[in-house]
């Protein structure tokens, strides 16, 4: 198809209008300084040569519309002449400010330039425009012509100007104008054509359209005028509340009056109830998000007036908002957001938004105004004024507090339900608490408490911020110093401050509520902290800060009633795993946890019972204890005990002294745990070895035994007095936990290193490695039983995971020790003392001194490497980690800094066991009580190679513990061997928490080493830094050192040398590898990481 287009000369009128449009367009916006005048169109000629159009496609053709795609080619004689004035500035800038007063140097040389700005007229002519474009042309009788260029149409244009004689300027102008023309064709011309066409083509249609539009506009204003109120009311819970809730307005007024008068919670409650009752308010939730409220109250004042007007006859116009529905409703930026629905109303009543309070506060507004005020309050400013102005805050605050309480306490945030009991309750509360409420409210205003993150799964249960009861329970277990209180409060408001996010507002102390509130309050504090993390996909995530490792993360309390449902996996794996992780003080629980470095089998002695929890909690200062403890410390109580002993040694020794001090405490704490628990340790450490270690129940028959052990340790006696701890053997035969602490003569267990003290031997694992490990190897890591039940050597200290040091102790999983160190509180001793005889502490001291011994020192170093290097990751943290693993929280390093998770590189996965042993487990395990595990794995390896020798050595070690200095090597060696020989590599449910990575490697190495050279000197050298490699020292938390493992594959990576130097190197590596963590991940860590990767996939 072809067409002939007529291209007649355009009329003067067209040229004039086009010139005017061009003028306005050219002069719109700021002009460059160079242009000193307006740009005027002097000539505009459309030319006589028409463009060539080639029809490529016709998409729509009708009497009143056309859509086609054309190829437009134009090479005509159209031209455009513009004139303006430009400012020619001096080409040379004077060097001196006084240049104007004196002849310039240039002038003196006879060169004259403008010394001042010069305004020069300028003409610019554009002609010879060549266009080649693909054009989409849409002609509509109603909408005019739309012309769009699908490519860059401008091929060339000729630009001539006044300054053509200056080549530079000419070239510059050419480039600039071409660029601007291209932009014009792309952006401006289509708009110009469209507007022109609307004037010409759609004259009639436009007039009709205008009429319609005017008509619509005429109708709209009333709707709109009314809309702000109604629309707002619909979108604004406040208005809705007003109309729906207080159709007559009187009820509300009466309410507000009542509130004014009595401010009684009842009136507030009544008010809240009233809104709830209103048909329209079914959705209203007491907790309307504050941000929503704010949005709603954007025009608070207008709202007030509108409200009053509307309120006067809310139903006069039936539902004007509906009848005069504005389709743009919700799109108008000035309107309140509609998404809140009516939830804001309930929230208003419930929240300390000052809404109801405002009603009371500002009698003038009455209900309407109060609603408006509430809206404003939602905005926040009005609320604050009102709150400050009136103690009305009390009412709304009460609601808010109640709201918070109900949400946190009930763990439910039913929007409709919010106004009910909890509202009333809150109101009642609030009446009493208005001061605290007010404060809370202000705080709330600052922080949008109204938003309950818990309903979004935030913070994660692992974050200990969740509102869920279960989470709260766990959190209370973890964080709660007052477990009972927490439990009392549906665990939701855990004293630990894990109470629901909403619990932020302090509520008056009321029996239930006060506990809840206190926990809430704690939470509040915790909640105040929000952190912004880069999201993996980009952007950022802002969420309440979740404290991990060194934070208040403590082992979630196991619901003793449902031990298996206590999230054992969280703790490490075996069902019994969780048992130990009770809320006992961090010490005990931690120790328990720690003992099983994996949370696997935490000591679950009698004291694991909830009632014990509180005791332990008090002992630990539960909130701090786990937090304070390093991972190892959490891992095992028994570890803790040795840790405490080692710690005592440590405390004696200078370098270890800090750790040691802490350690003694820790150990003592462990001991204390033992004794306080009557040393009923279901030590996970032991149990760690057996997956059902839970059953491992060290029945330390008496604190006396513990004391005796302590005494023994103090004495440094070799005596393996039965601490009266009989270890009920774990379910796994592996653990010869049945051997009483004092009892097992056969395995190295009975052999208690002198000074080991019953406490040391008290722990089976500890017995096996306990004395040795605790005194000499990583004190904290002594784990019970890595060896099979029958294998006394297995019971001997597990490979000296942490043989090396007090530091080990310090970082040992032993809750006390590690905790001390972490807590930085001088010692957990005091808490340790809670349960156990002071002697324990003394024992710890003795051990600490032993630790100080050279061998200890070496161990300490090793320990430190592993212990110090390890981040303080508590079992709790490990549990958290598991929680995170299982939760939808990404563990990606982008989301959470790894520095907080020692376990990050070596995820704590249950069942870490490699041929080399529980390498991964060992490090952490050893350090954590997983040491037991490491013992286990070592035991496995060692058992394979030199079980008997190991046992012997271990026994020797135990004896030598007393002589820590004297027989560190032997001890370590024995330790290592004992576990190795004692027990086939047993699947330890220990998690390698960063601290023990090196230890892990060592552990695995050690088992192998033990196999190959059970008595390897390096192991023996447990006392010596080098020997630590093989001794507990390797597990001691010495830095991730390359361990010399005889054959441990995991160890081999780090196995390079057992010398302290290696250990240190390993430590350094580990540190390097995970900065916040322990150091380069141990082999175990690596394995763990691989496993983690697999899990992720």
Curated annotation (Swiss-Prot):
Biased composition (Basic residues): 252-263, 284-293
Biased composition (Polar residues): 662-675, 784-796, 1004-1024
Record's protein name: Mitochondrial distribution and morphology protein 34
Sequence ranges of Low complexity compositional bias: 274-283, 508-519, 572-586, 759-779, 923-943, 1045-1059
Quaternary structure note: Component of the ER-mitochondria encounter structure (ERMES) or MDM complex, composed of MMM1, MDM10, MDM12 and MDM34.
Topology in the lipid bilayer: Multi-pass membrane protein
Phylogenetic placement of the source organism: Eukaryota, Fungi, Dikarya, Basidiomycota, Ustilaginomycotina
Species, as recorded: Mycosarcoma maydis
Domain of life: Eukaryota
Segments of skewed composition (Basic and acidic residues): 205-229, 406-416
GO biological process: mitochondrial genome maintenance; mitochondrion organization; mitochondrion-endoplasmic reticulum membrane tethering; phospholipid transport
Gene: MDM34
Disordered: annotated span: 204-305, 317-343, 390-427, 480-520, 556-600, 645-675, 716-817, 923-1097
């Amino acid at each position: 198809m072809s067409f002939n287009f007529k291209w007649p000369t355009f009329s003067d009128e067209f040229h004039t209008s086009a010139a005017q449009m061009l003028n306005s367009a050219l002069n719109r916006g700021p002009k460059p300084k160079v242009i000193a005048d307006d740009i005027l169109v002097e000539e505009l000629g459309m030319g006589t040569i028409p463009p060539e159009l080639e029809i490529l496609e016709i998409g729509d053709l009708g009497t009143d519309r056309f859509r086609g795609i054309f190829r437009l080619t134009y090479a005509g004689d159209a031209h455009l002449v513009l004139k303006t004035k430009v400012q020619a500035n001096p080409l040379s800038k004077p060097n001196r400010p006084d240049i104007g007063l004196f002849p310039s140097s240039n002038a003196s040389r006879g060169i004259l330039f403008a010394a001042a700005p010069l305004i020069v007229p300028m003409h610019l002519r554009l002609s010879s425009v060549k266009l080649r474009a693909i054009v989409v042309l849409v002609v509509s009788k109603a909408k005019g012509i739309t012309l769009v260029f699908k490519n860059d149409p401008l091929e060339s244009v000729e630009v001539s100007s006044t300054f053509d004689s200056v080549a530079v300027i000419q070239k510059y102008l050419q480039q600039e104008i071409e660029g601007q023309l291209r932009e014009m064709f792309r952006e401006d011309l289509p708009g110009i054509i469209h507007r022109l066409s609307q004037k010409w083509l759609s004259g009639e249609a436009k007039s009709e359209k205008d009429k319609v539009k005017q008509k619509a506009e005429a109708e709209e204003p009333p709707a709109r005028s009314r809309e702000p109120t109604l629309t707002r009311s619909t979108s604004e819970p406040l208005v809705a509340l007003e109309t729906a809730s207080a159709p007559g307005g009187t009820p509300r007024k009466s309410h507000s009056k009542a509130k004014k008068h009595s401010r009684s919670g009842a009136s507030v409650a009544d008010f809240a109830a009233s809104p709830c009752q209103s048909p329209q308010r079914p959705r209203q939730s007491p907790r309307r998000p504050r941000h929503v409220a704010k949005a709603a109250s954007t025009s608070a004042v207008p709202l007030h007036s509108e409200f009053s007007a509307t309120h006067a006859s809310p139903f006069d116009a039936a539902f004007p908002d509906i009848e005069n529905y504005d389709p743009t409703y919700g799109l108008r930026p000035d309107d309140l957001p509609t998404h809140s629905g009516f939830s804001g109303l309930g929230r208003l009543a419930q929240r300390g938004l000052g809404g109801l309070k405002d009603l009371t506060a500002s009698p003038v507004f009455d209900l309407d105004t109060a609603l408006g005020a509430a809206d404003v309050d939602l905005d926040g400013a009005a609320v604050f004024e009102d709150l400050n102005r009136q103690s009305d805050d009390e009412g709304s605050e009460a609601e808010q507090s109640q709201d918070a309480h109900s949400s946190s306490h009930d763990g439910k945030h039913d929007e409709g339900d919010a106004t009910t009991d909890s509202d009333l309750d809150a109101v009642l509360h609030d009446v009493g608490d208005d001061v605290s409420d007010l404060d809370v409210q202000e705080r709330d205003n600052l922080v949008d408490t109204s938003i309950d993150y818990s309903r979004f799964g935030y913070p994660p249960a692992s974050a200990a911020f969740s509102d869920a009861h279960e989470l709260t329970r766990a959190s209370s277990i973890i964080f709660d110093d007052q477990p009972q209180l927490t439990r009392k409060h549906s665990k939701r408001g855990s004293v630990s401050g894990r109470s629901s996010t909403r619990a932020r507002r302090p509520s008056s102390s009321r029996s239930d509520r006060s506990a809840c509130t206190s926990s809430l309050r704690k939470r509040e504090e915790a909640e105040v902290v929000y952190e912004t993390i880069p999201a993996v996909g980009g952007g950022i995530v802002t969420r309440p800060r979740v404290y991990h490792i060194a934070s208040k993360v403590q082992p979630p309390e196991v619901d003793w009633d449902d031990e298996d449902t206590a999230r054992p996996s969280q703790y490490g794996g075996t069902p019994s795993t969780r048992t130990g992780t009770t809320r006992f003080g961090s010490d005990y629980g931690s120790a328990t946890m720690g003992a099983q470095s994996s949370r696997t089998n935490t000591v679950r002695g009698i004291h694991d019972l909830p009632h014990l929890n509180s005791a332990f909690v008090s002992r630990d200062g539960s909130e701090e204890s786990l937090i304070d403890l390093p991972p190892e410390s959490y891992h095992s109580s028994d570890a803790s005990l040795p840790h405490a002993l080692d710690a005592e040694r440590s405390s004696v020794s200078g370098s270890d002294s800090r750790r040691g001090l802490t350690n003694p405490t820790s150990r003592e704490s462990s001991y204390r745990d033992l004794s306080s628990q009557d040393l009923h340790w279901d030590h996970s450490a032991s149990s760690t070895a057996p997956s059902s270690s839970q059953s491992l129940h060290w029945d330390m028959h008496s604190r006396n035994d513990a004391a005796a052990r302590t005494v023994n340790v103090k004495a440094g006696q070799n005596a393996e007095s039965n601490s009266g701890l009989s270890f009920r053997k774990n379910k796994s035969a592996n653990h010869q936990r049945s051997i009483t602490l004092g009892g097992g003569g056969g395995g190295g267990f009975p052999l208690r290193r002198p000074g080991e003290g019953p406490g040391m031997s008290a722990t089976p694992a500890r017995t096996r490695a306990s004395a040795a490990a605790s005194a000499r190897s990583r004190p904290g890591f002594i784990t019970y039983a890595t060896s099979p039940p029958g294998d006394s050597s297995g019971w001997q200290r597990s490979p000296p995971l942490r043989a090396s040091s007090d530091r080990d102790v310090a970082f040992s999983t032993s809750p006390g020790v590690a905790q001390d160190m972490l807590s930085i509180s001088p010692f957990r001793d005091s808490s340790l003392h809670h349960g156990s005889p002071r002697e324990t502490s003394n024992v710890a001291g003795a051990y600490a001194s032993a630790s100080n011994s050279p061998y200890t020192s070496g161990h300490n170093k090793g320990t430190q490497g592993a212990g110090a290097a390890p981040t303080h990751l508590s079992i709790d943290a490990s549990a958290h980690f598991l929680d995170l693993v299982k939760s939808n929280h990404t563990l990606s390093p982008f989301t959470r800094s790894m520095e907080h998770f020692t376990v990050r590189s070596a995820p704590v996965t249950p069942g870490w066991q490699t041929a080399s042993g529980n390498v991964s487990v060992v490090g952490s395990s050893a350090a954590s009580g997983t040491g037991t595990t490491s013992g286990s794995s070592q035991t496995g390896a060692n058992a394979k190679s030199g079980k008997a020798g190991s046992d012997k050595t271990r026994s020797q070690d135990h004896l030598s513990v007393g002589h820590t200095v004297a027989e560190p090597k032997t001890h370590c060696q024995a330790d290592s061997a004992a576990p190795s020989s004692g027990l086939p590599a047993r699947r330890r449910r220990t998690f390698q928490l960063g601290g023990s990575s090196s230890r892990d490697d060592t552990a695995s190495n050690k088992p192998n080493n033990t196999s190959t050279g059970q008595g390897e000197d390096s192991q023996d050298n447990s006392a010596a830094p080098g020997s630590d490699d093989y001794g507990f020292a390797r597990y001691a938390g010495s830095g991730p050192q390359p361990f010399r493992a005889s054959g441990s594959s995991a160890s081999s990576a780090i196995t390079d040398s057992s010398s302290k130097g290696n250990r240190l190197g390993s430590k350094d590596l580990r540190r390097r590898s995970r900065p916040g963590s322990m150091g380069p991940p141990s082999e175990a860590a690596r394995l763990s990481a691989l496993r983690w990767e697999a899990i992720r996939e």
